Amino acid sequence: VPETLEVLLPYLPLRNADPLPHTWEVTSDTIAAWVAASLSLDLVVLKSVDGIRSGGVLINRLSQPVETEVVDPSFIPFVISKKVRVVILNGRVPDRLESWLQGHPVTGTTIGF
């Protein structure tokens, strides 16, 4: 684990490339996905819920767009079209991210795995 913290300031790269629609349907979720796609990286999204649900049931694996308020409306279509591998985890659950990073099965939603 690095001893320093890196902060990405995406304004200039986004302004120069202008890759995303100018709409309130694009928020930090899709911006993070754009960064991951641009760098050919997988993306871990930490939210305050366990993942994306449909009819109250957690979706473990997602391969098609669904309506959700967990991520912005542009996020799922973007990551599917760009083939970004994503996992959505509950960042409020202690050790959830660490367990996932260690390869243990955890509650969450994966897209593209």
List PLM regions with ranges.
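C-terminal catalytic "cap/lid" subdomain
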Residues: 1-113
